[in-house]
Amino acid sequence: MSKQLIYSGKAKDIYTTEDENLIISTYKDQATAFNGVKKEQIAGKGVLNNQISSFIFEKLNVAGVATHFVEKLSDTEQLNKKVKIIPLEVVLRNYTAGSFSKRFGVDEGIALETPIVEFYYKNDDLDDPFINDEHVKFLQIAGDQQIAYLKEETRRINELLKVWFAEIGLKLIDFKLEFGFDKDGKIILADEFSPDNCRLWDADGNHMDKDVFRRGLGELTDVYEIVWEKLQGLK
């Protein structure tokens, strides 16, 4: 399958395929934090991210969630549907943590009675600012119906993920999703789902995600390997 590099991101390289509606995503060993300010090459990270994300996306597909995932091609590669990415990071929070705790001056780990959905404008030059529905409409990123769908679909995905992670003894604190338009103009889930873009805590409150790298708490791949091993025990 011939391929040509069309985009190089922090965590993945994207290549064309012979089918104009399909792309190959190649996961890198690079870890970044604080919008790329902290950066490090970590051997084995790309393989683990691809394994975890492929596994989760396969389960989401089976559960009826429309995603860009087609199949895992190799240790670091997966075949995806080509989408036009919506320039929003859709964050769902089940517990207080990270920037939420800093913004509102509250402790981490407080359970939210109703999960909170937030939007962040995907713009590196602006440091991905926190925005609301009216900003999304002003920037002509999405309309009312599309905004409502993004929130509804994110909440539906959350209900699935919470159950799966609870089954393996992990608490889903929060996560970030990205969506895009497929060739038919339908909004589908894109990007990835791995400890790079979610927070997972074990029963003792230990971080099982990229906060290990972000906060210098230990070896990233050791933690990701534990998450991957646990996921393989899911029914």
Swiss-Prot record:
Which SUPFAM superfamilies does this entry report, sorted A to Z?
Answer: SAICAR synthase-like
What PROSITE patterns has UniProt attached to this entry?
Answer: SAICAR_SYNTHETASE_1 (PS01057), SAICAR_SYNTHETASE_2 (PS01058)
Q: Which GO terms describe its biological process?
A: 'de novo' IMP biosynthetic process; cobalamin biosynthetic process
What keywords sit in the KW lines?
A: ATP-binding, Ligase, Nucleotide-binding, Purine biosynthesis
The answer to whether UniProt assigns keyword Transcription to this entry is no
| Reactions accelerated catalytically | 5-amino-1-(5-phospho-D-ribosyl)imidazole-4-carboxylate + L-aspartate + ATP = (2S)-2-[5-amino-1-(5-phospho-beta-D-ribosyl)imidazole-4-carboxamido]succinate + ADP + phosphate + 2 H(+)
Pathway given for this chain reads: Purine metabolism; IMP biosynthesis via de novo pathway; 5-amino-1-(5-phospho-D-ribosyl)imidazole-4-carboxamide from 5-amino-1-(5-phospho-D-ribosyl)imidazole-4-carboxylate: step 1/2
- Output the Gene3D superfamilies linked to this UniProt entry: ATP-grasp fold, B domain, Phosphorylase Kinase, domain 1
Molecular function per GO? ATP binding; phosphoribosylaminoimidazolesuccinocarboxamide synthase activity
Identify the EC number(s).
Answer: 6.3.2.6
Query: Which Pfam families does the entry mention?
Result: SAICAR_synt (PF01259)
Q: Has keyword DNA damage?
A: no
Primary enzyme class:
ligase
**UniProt family annotation:** Belongs to the SAICAR synthetase family.
What NCBIfam families does its record include?
purC (TIGR00081)
Q: What is this protein called?
A: Phosphoribosylaminoimidazole-succinocarboxamide synthase
Which species does this protein come from?
Streptococcus pneumoniae (strain ATCC 700669 / Spain 23F-1)
Please state the gene responsible for encoding this protein: purC
